[in-house]
Amino acid sequence: DSALQELSAILDGMHVSEKEISSGVIKVPKYRSLYIDNSLKDSDMIKVDRDSSFKDIIRGIRNVKDSDFAVPPALKSTLRNYQKTGFRWMKTMAAYGFSGILADDMGIGKTLQVITLLEDERLQCKDSLSLVVCPSSLILNWQSEIEKFSKTLTSIIISGSSDERKVQI
């Protein structure tokens, strides 16, 4: 039966055990939501009920541009539209408890997008602390960009040998 083969392939892709299948309860991590939705959306043979939280995750991730996450006022006019979308994507990932990698061509503003995220986190929680880990060749650039674009963030560079870093910390 092709429906069973299709379902078996999906369950294999999610590494669902026979024990879970036998129990009738399959718990799937949130990060698999898109995989499940994509695997099942075109299937006429498999009936799946999606609860409201599942639908919310899918809707949120698929409609990042339309999210309610507002760019901090101090940076709103600085960011280009694609950078605002990048900021909203990072906020969406964080809202659902996901991680992500912001990657694109070099020189189109990832640092500024992350500074915008950090600025927003600071506005939401004054006591928030963040750690940026970057190649030593970019440390001064990060500090310069923070000073240039943020009035609320402060930065401290911790670099040097292991012993020097221990003293700085």
Where are these regions (language model features)?
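Conserved G/P- and acidic residue-centered "switch" motifs that form tight phosphate/ATP-binding loops
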Residues: 83, 107, 132
